[in-house]
Amino acid sequence: YTATRDNCCILDERFGSYCPTTCG
């Protein structure tokens, strides 16, 4: 899953939902 400016938060099966600092 690649984070984008429109969708920063990621829903991962193992790690759960999180927002990478590399967003934007």
Swiss-Prot record:
UniProt name for this protein: Fibrinogen gamma chain
Cell location: Secreted
Example GO biological process: protein polymerization
Gene this chain is encoded by: FGG
SUPFAM superfamilies hit by this protein: Fibrinogen coiled-coil and central regions (SSF58010)
Gene3D superfamilies assigned to the protein according to its UniProt record, in alphabetical order: 1.20.5.50
Keywords in alphabetical order: Blood coagulation, Coiled coil, Disulfide bond, Hemostasis, Secreted
First-listed, main subcellular location of the protein, grouped into a coarse class: secreted
Top-rank taxon: Eukaryota
Subunit comment: Heterohexamer; disulfide linked. Contains 2 sets of 3 non-identical chains (alpha, beta and gamma). The 2 heterotrimers are in head to head conformation with the N-termini in a small central domain.
